[in-house]
Amino acid sequence: VVLIDGKGSFHQAEIVNITKSKCEYQITHSQEYPKTWNNNIHLAIAPTKNIDRIEWLTEKITEIGFDELSFLNCRFSERRVVKNERLERIIVSAAKQSRKSWMPQLNEMVSFKDFISMPHKGLKFIAHCYDQFPKTDLCSALNKEDIKEDVLILVGPEGDFSVDEVDLALKN
């Protein structure tokens, strides 16, 4: 049996005892795998109304190798509740299917204002549609080979962030 711990290791194990309520195993070999990115990639997103899109996104960020996923309750959010239990199962399934030894940390939904007030080190990006605020090309900014910082990417709801939310994010 092959086991993953979600923190960079695959473990080869042998089943030693099976009962009606549990299965005992003995780890025979462990192999650690380094992350493909030296720092953390954190996606904070306002969930869409259609939960299938959120489930698909959760699967893909696991396969790609993101480190953290947060859900934001924004002014124009159409979905105010996300069930993390289901998304945790999707993360585990996607990690197994894509043979990833690292799984992203899934955070509880939080208000945009509370999220922005939390400390975040490294590079920060916000996707928005407003012309009055400066814009950075994300691909160009992240395409540098010498990036040695954590990266936080904010993505708003289907109606975009409010002007106040973008302003608050850029000030913090």
State where each predicted segment sits.
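Short, surface-exposed acidic/glycine-rich loop or hinge patches that mediate macromolecular interfaces
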Residues: 48, 159-160
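Short connector loops at helix/strand junctions that flank enzyme active sites
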Residues: 10, 20-22, 36-41, 148-150
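RNA substrate-binding interface of SAM-dependent RNA methyltransferases
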Residues: 30-126
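N-terminal positively charged helical leader segments and presequences
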Residues: 1-32
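Structured adenosyl-cofactor binding patch, chiefly the S-adenosyl-L-methionine
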Residues: 162-172
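Thr-Gly-centered strand-to-loop micro-motif
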Residues: 154-157, 172
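A mid-sequence, solvent-exposed acidic-amphipathic segment
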Residues: 109-149, 153-154
